[in-house]
Amino acid sequence: ELLYEHGIGAGDPVAIYSSSTPHWPLAFFTATAFGRVSVPILRDFSGIEAEHVLKHSESRVLFVGKQQLSRLSEECLSSLDLVFDIDSLEIIRSNAGGKINKERHEPQPNDLAALIYTSGTTGQAKGVMLTHINFVTNVIAGFYIHTIGPKDTLLSILPLAHTYELSLGMLYPFASGAKVCYISKAPTPSYLVKVMANV
């Protein structure tokens, strides 16, 4: 509702620049609801890299972690309509004008769902366009690869801005009812041994 009140509707890009947390999927589903487009940004991108993605994608909204927020310039933040703290899901910055309600749009299979930017090993990061049917196909493929269900618990290690982790580490468990745990540190072998003992 809040995004609609600020005129953020179908086709509008909504970026997520954060570590993987339980609120990351909430931001993703908020972004893709009613035809909006999710723009996941790798958590380790520098401020310059993240600002390139925000500008290139023409993102209007940003869900951001505290660590990542500190990397962004004032000029970048002032170009966004809304900035949310991903941990509290509260607006921490609003540059939007008057409230304008946009008509709701139910996403169609071939509508753009996400713009996922590569790490840019041969230059600046480039956006890969993925539709809703791309993600649905990946989730269905997951059931053929390895069936999981409500009694299963998965440990999310890769950043959710990676296509693989987004598809098979978040959307597939969500569709199957499985539980997902997120790590708060780098996945070193010693840390993973401790985490696995508690999952």
Where are these regions (language model features)?
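Conserved AMP-binding/adenylate-forming
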Residues: L2-F45
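Conserved AMP-binding
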Residues: Y17-T21, L42, E51, I148, ...
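Short hydrophobic alpha-helices that are characteristic scaffold elements of the AMP-binding
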Residues: F28-F34, H56, H162, L171-A175
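Conserved adenylate-forming
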Residues: G47, K55, S78-D87, S184-V199
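ANL superfamily adenylate-forming
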Residues: Q67-P109
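Conserved pre-ATP/AMP-binding loop-to-beta segment of ANL
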Residues: K99-Y117, Q124, T147-T153
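Conserved AMP-binding A3 loop
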Residues: A113-T137
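Conserved AMP-binding/adenylation subdomain of ANL enzymes
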Residues: V136-T153, L160-V199
